[in-house]
Amino acid sequence: MIKTLSLLISCFILAIAAGLSQAQEAPPASLAAPEAAAKATPADGHVIHVTAPHLIDGKVRGPFHHYCKIVSPEPFIECLLYETEDNNAKLIGVEYIVAKTVTRDEKVLPRKAWKKVWHDHSVEGVIGNVKVLDMPPDKAKEFADTVAKTDGIIFSLWPEGAKLPTGKVSIGTMVGHAVHQ
């Protein structure tokens, strides 16, 4: 009887210890879905939502969801690119949108480099592939008019169909962009 009771107590203690061990190994819920940070971060402010297809490695892909923020008034805009608008969508690229007064300055960016990897957003707007979402029409037009005075460069970080990034970064461009000679 004492042996049976000792065995039951031992099993009970082992079960509790195993449960505590598992609980300690599981990531805290606060890491999986952190509360809003009190301190502002560089990731804050990507709230301008735009969709547009891209030409990546010779293939039309998308449309991609761009979540953009205006970093400085020249303008300098950065966009985080996703395949979907799901809140758990993976980041698949980045687009930098920069005023033509900066990108067309030979002292800042050699013309040969601009011609190869940058695209003109005034052309992209005319083609009609870009849609500004989640804002009133007058604000969407104001944003589109601002972007029309810029050039863009797209870094595609996640190859199509890959389960993980491979380390290969492709330079995407707008659909309809021709590499200038």
Task: Tell where the protein language model's regions lie, with residue ranges.
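Bacterial N-terminal signal peptides
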Residues: 8-17
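Generic detector of short, well-ordered, non-transmembrane alpha-helical segments enriched
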Residues: 17-19, 77
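Primary mode marks residue(s) on the alpha4-beta5-alpha5 output face of response regulator receiver
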Residues: 25-181
